Design a protein with these regions (language model features):
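Charged, glycine-rich intrinsically disordered N-terminal tails and low-complexity linkers that flank
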Residues: 1-65
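Generic structural marker for isolated residues within well-ordered, non-membrane alpha-helices
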Residues: 39, 71, 147
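Short glycine-rich, polar/acidic loop-and-turn segments at beta strand-coil junctions
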Residues: 46-48, 66-68, 72, 87-89, ...
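Acidic-basic catalytic patches of nuclease active cores, encompassing PD-(D/E)XK
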Residues: 60-85
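Nucleic-acid nuclease catalytic cores
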Residues: 77-103, 107-205
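Helix-loop elements that line ligand-binding/catalytic pockets
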Residues: 198-218
Length: 218
């Protein structure tokens, strides 16, 4: 059963996340988080190290402040959805007690009543390799894993991910908006991989047995 837990403040919400796998953590479990590998995340989960505080990083501040505006514009662009946001809360599923989902927004498809996930990303391009992450029809691997984790926890039917991609050239700012739609029915096999990987990882946490390092593909 999926339940929603509401918190009185952001510090209380942050405290409740400890000991559980969140969306961005899921990519670390699978070795697909470019900022943290699976061993580093394991060290955090067993208390050897503390997560780095990135709340004052400029890109985090920008993304946090831009989120509500991007969500509002998405709602204007997609009248077929009811768009809702629940702050300082998390969704929990008793099938996966090791996981939580804190969403940028929740969608209801008005014609069918289907429930979906809204995920917002802001990204600034700094070079050709960074640009390649957002080229084509696929989202970066770590964000793909994140939204599949959310599908696992919520049992919702689809994801709408909106990315605002920013580039600065000669003091001129260019913004590109890209929308990505993912149907749960198309990614069930990948969700099963995430379920299995997260369960195995949490067993290693309980046993305090360090996992083998997963190296990124070259």
């Amino acid at each position: 059963m999926v339940t929603r837990k509401k918190f009185a403040s952001k510090p209380e919400w942050l405290l409740a996340r400890k000991g559980k796998i969140g969306g961005s953590d899921a990519a670390a479990v699978l070795g697909l988080n470019p900022y943290k590998n699976n061993v580093e995340f394991w060290n955090e989960m067993v208390g050897i190290t503390k997560p780095r505080d990135i709340s004052n990083e400029q890109y985090v501040i920008y993304g946090s402040r831009a989120e509500e505006h991007i969500r509002a514009i998405f709602a204007l662009d997609h009248p077929e959805y009811k768009v809702e946001y629940f702050g300082d809360n998390m969704l929990l599923n008793d099938k996966y007690p090791f996981a939580h989902a804190s969403l940028d927004g929740e969608l209801t498809e008005l014609e069918t009543g289907r429930k979906g996930i809204f995920e917002c990303k802001t990204s600034e391009l700094f070079g050709s390799m960074h640009k390649e992450k957002w080229d084509g029809e696929h989202i970066p691997d770590n964000y793909y894993i994140q939204v599949l984790h959310y599908l696992m926890v919520t049992e919702y039917e689809f994801v709408e991910l909106r990315a605002q991609i920013k580039s600065v050239w000669n003091k001129s700012i260019r913004l590109i908006t890209k929308d990505y739609h993912i149907e749960r029915a198309d990614v069930e096999e990948d969700i099963e991989i995430i379920k299995r990987s997260e369960r195995e990882f949490m067993e290693l946490v309980k046993k305090r047995k360090k996992p083998a390092l997963i190296l990124p593909e070259i």
